[in-house]
Amino acid sequence: MDLLAIDLDFDVSESKLERNKRLKQKVSIETDGWTPRVQCFGHLSKNGVVLGEEAYILEQSKFAAEEQYYLGNYSLAKKFAFQALDVPTDSSSIEYHRLSSGEINEIEDIIRRCEMKLENKQSN
């Protein structure tokens, strides 16, 4: 069964768990040697990848900076924000990404707010 196929056996009275179980029996996905790329805000430390390690995808640095800022990890948020502003030397790299001027302003704002929060923490 194709993952994008329409579920013709769908029944309105069927519970979500029953439907998921039935669909899992129809679809087989081979996961050997495949690691999903994390794309969603709030799921950046998924699958045991520790934030800040080399395995972490640079492309996600902007989202990681935002997430860590809202979690209160200001020094880590600042680190990711600077990492997001760094452009890899190889533009064909999978890690290469273009930031719009608005995104650059957002990242610079995160850095500024992190510095303010860290200064306030030290003074208290």
Curated annotation (Swiss-Prot):
One of its GO terms (cellular component) is cytosol. This is Uncharacterized protein C887.08. It comes from Schizosaccharomyces pombe (strain 972 / ATCC 24843) (Fission yeast). It comes from the Eukaryota.
